């Protein structure tokens, strides 16, 4: 580490203020918090900030449904979010809201600077308009029949059934998802940010070598497809900030949302003496700026955000650290299975430090998805934290307290072993710095194994029974306690609460510099249990509680929908059985068992996945519009059913040689047909 402390500003992506924090959100906040705590442990100055993303049509409409104002709703959500983050020991220096005066002023300033510098233009566009609610409709608030495959009840930007992308004006029989009314076309002036003007700068920033390779590669794809002007305005009614100098025009939520990073920091500066906003945000700042985000919002953070900052005279981020999604037990989080776990539900049943440790043990610097396997979670935390690390203290502390009045030996008996533990500091530091937390944990647990091996070989419980060996006993146990101290110093960024209890036990603060020399002749306190093992019954209770939460949420949603429609509809009401056909017509359809050899996303297609299918001696390529329901890696190797004699169809992205069968209403609620084991590729389905 450099002699002069670094000055860092670190952010997490802003949670949207219309729902609860869940364990997927917590991955990012735990990852960032571990990195921040490591930096602080090394003496660097860190300002760690976040805020709620509190604008947009969904918030406005949800507040209306609840019968409260948007301001009331986002205030309640903010309180809930902050309580959840505090429960997981996320050490934010400030948590704010994008619906703040600081954000209004900064967003307006950035917009006016962009406009002054020639990066804002306007033109008239035609949009669908809800005549009952008197509002323009975002794409996702229009539903109708797909113009391509004629599937009903599809969103206004793409079809969940066939994967076709289109504008909402192309829908057949479009309806407003807000009121059910038939929308009409209406012209409106919109404002655009000229992103293409920043292409050279963005390419240079991409090639700087600081971005993750996956992010840089994705940006290169976007450059090759051509950057487009970005619509930054929305029409009233809209919950957000009005555009300066314009009437009934509001900033699109994604313009003022990232400005929320600046606004939260400005709010912190205004209440912290000596903290200078300009020092961190001026164009030539020597401070460091890092954003932790999920892979679903890379586009906004790697293109629009740095371009907005460049165009308005502010500094750009040093890096954008991107992580993958969280799965549970190998599948996407499911409300019906109870694996869609809210942060608050987890905190009622389990120690947050367990999740912090497990996430750390599986995190790396790549954009990989992380699977929370609940059985492995239990075994790893109990084996590593309880059996290896905490047990190291408990098996030595009793002798020190009972036989030596809590005092460690004056002489340290194993300097070479201790130096081996201290020598690992540089390796572990580099792994923390580069966000290779999983490798850091492996280094730490390997040291824990060595420490326990030492205690096993010295067997203090045997020495304690032998006459005249008090000094040897004290020295053995003092070595064990000191090795535990080093391990807990390394673990302090991951498990701050356990570290605090350890500091109380050792009667000394854990510092990175402090481990250079062992504690000798030092008095420790009487040992108390530092950490409890995970009881599988608590995990079962958490899953059941999550199911109950989901059921209650669904019941409330269904009740609201029923009241809105005055009658609930069955699946057959929504999708009636087709007219009868003759058996010969059905027999003409050749359905076969297929094994999914490979599955991948289709660039520039919002809903399509591309499959290579083995149908028993022949491989078929098929495109299917189920991307919103599955990740490609979830499907590879599975058996499914396909229509094999469907005439090949040439699509924009290639030839589709059949159709995969799936059931469900669409969106994320789609399920491919999966035959039982025993069925083989190529078998006919009768």
Curated annotation (Swiss-Prot):
GO molecular function ontology, one term from the record: ATP binding
Cofactor note: Binds 1 zinc ion per subunit.
Motif window: 'HIGH' region: 15-25
Pfam families referenced in this protein's UniProt entry, alphabetically: Anticodon_3, tRNA-synt_1g, tRNA_bind
Positions of ATP binding: 335
Disulfide bonding pattern of the chain: none
Keyword line: Aminoacyl-tRNA synthetase, ATP-binding, Cytoplasm, Ligase, Metal-binding, Nucleotide-binding, Protein biosynthesis, RNA-binding, tRNA-binding, Zinc
Motif residue range(s): 'KMSKS' region: 332-336
Keyword Plastid: no
GO annotations of cellular component type: cytosol
Annotated compartments: Cytoplasm
GO biological process per UniProt: methionyl-tRNA aminoacylation
Sites where the protein binds Zn(2+): 146, 149, 159, 162
SUPFAM superfamilies given in the database record: Anticodon-binding domain of a subclass of class I aminoacyl-tRNA synthetases, Methionyl-tRNA synthetase (MetRS), Zn-domain, Nucleic acid-binding proteins, Nucleotidylyl transferase
NCBIfam families: metG (TIGR00398), metG_C_term (TIGR00399), PRK00133.1 (NF001100)
Subunit structure: Homodimer.
Assigned protein family: Belongs to the class-I aminoacyl-tRNA synthetase family. MetG type 1 subfamily.
Name recorded for this polypeptide: Methionine--tRNA ligase
Species, as recorded: Vibrio campbellii (strain ATCC BAA-1116)
Taxonomic path: Bacteria, Pseudomonadati, Pseudomonadota, Gammaproteobacteria, Vibrionales
């Amino acid at each position: 580490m450099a002699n002069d402390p670094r000055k860092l500003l670190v952010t997490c992506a802003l949670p949207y203020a219309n729902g609860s924090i869940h364990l997927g959100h917590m991955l990012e906040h735990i990852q960032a918090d571990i990195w921040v705590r490591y930096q602080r442990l090394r003496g660097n100055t860190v300002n760690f900030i976040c805020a709620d993303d509190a604008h947009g049509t969904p918030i406005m409409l949800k507040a209306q449904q609840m019968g409260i104002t948007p301001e009331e709703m986002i205030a309640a959500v903010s309180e809930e979010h902050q309580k959840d983050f505090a429960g997981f020991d996320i050490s934010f220096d400030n948590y704010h809201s994008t619906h703040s005066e600081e954000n209004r002023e900064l967003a307006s300033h950035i917009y006016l600077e962009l406009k002054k510098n020639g990066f804002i233009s306007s033109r008239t566009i035609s949009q669908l308009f809800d005549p009952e609610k008197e509002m323009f409709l975002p794409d996702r608030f229009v539903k109708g029949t797909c113009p391509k495959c004629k599937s009903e009840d599809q969103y206004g930007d793409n079809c969940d059934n066939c994967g076709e992308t289109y504008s909402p004006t192309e829908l057949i029989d479009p309806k407003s998802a807000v009121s059910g009314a038939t929308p009409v076309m209406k012209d409106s002036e919109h404002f655009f940010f000229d992103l293409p003007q920043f292409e050279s700068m963005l390419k240079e920033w991409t090639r700087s070598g600081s971005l993750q390779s996956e992010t840089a590669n994705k940006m290169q794809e976007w450059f090759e497809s051509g950057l487009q002007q970005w619509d930054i305005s929305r029409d009233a009614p809209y919950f957000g900030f009005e555009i300066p100098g314009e009437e009934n025009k509001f900033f699109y939520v994604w313009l003022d949302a990232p400005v929320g990073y600046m606004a939260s920091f400005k709010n912190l500066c205004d209440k912290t003496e000596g903290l200078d906003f300009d020092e961190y945000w001026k164009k030539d700042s020597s401070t460091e700026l890092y954003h932790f985000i999920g892979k679903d919002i890379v586009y906004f953070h790697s293109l629009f955000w740095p371009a907005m900052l460049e165009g308005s005279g502010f500094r750009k981020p040093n890096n954008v650290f991107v992580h993958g999604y969280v799965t549970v037990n190998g599948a996407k989080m499911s409300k019906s299975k109870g694996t869609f776990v809210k942060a608050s539900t987890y905190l009622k049943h389990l120690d947050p430090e367990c999740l912090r440790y497990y996430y750390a043990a599986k995190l790396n610097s790549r954009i990989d998805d992380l699977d929370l396997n609940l059985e492995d979670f239990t075994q790893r935390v109990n084996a590593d934290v309880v059996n290896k690390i905490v047990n190291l203290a408990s098996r030595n502390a009793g002798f020190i307290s009972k036989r030596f009045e809590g005092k460690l030996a004056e002489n340290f008996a194993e300097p070479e072993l201790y130096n081996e533990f201290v020598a690992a500091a540089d390796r572990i530091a580099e792994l923390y710095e580069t966000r290779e937390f999983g490798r850091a944990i492996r280094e730490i647990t390997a040291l824990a194994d060595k420490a326990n091996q030492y205690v096993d070989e010295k067997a203090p419980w045997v020495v304690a029974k032998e006459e005249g060996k008090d000094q040897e006993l004290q020295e053995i146990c003092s070595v064990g306690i000191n090795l535990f101290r080093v391990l807990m110093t390394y673990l302090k960024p991951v498990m701050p609460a356990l570290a605090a209890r350890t500091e109380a036990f050792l009667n000394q603060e854990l510092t990175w510099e402090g481990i250079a020399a062992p504690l000798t002749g030092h008095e420790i306190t009487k040992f108390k249990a530092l950490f409890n093992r995970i009881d599988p019954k608590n995990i079962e209770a958490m899953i059941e509680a999550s199911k109950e939460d989901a059921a209650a949420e669904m019941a409330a949603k269904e009740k609201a929908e029923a009241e809105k429609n005055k009658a609930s509809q069955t699946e057959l009401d929504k999708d009636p059985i087709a007219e009868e056909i003759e058996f010969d017509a059905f027999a003409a359809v050749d359905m076969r068992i297929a094994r999914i050899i490979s599955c991948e996303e289709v660039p520039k297609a919002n809903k399509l996945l591309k499959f290579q299918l083995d149908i028993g001696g022949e491989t078929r390529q098929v495109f299917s519009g189920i991307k919103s329901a599955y990740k490609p890696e979830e499907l590879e190797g599975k058996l499914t059913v396909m229509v094999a004699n469907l005439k090949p169809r040439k699509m924009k992205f290639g030839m589709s040689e059949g159709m995969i069968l799936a059931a469900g209403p669409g969106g994320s609620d789609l399920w491919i047909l999966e035959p039982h084991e025993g069925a083989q590729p190529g078998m006919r389905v009768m």
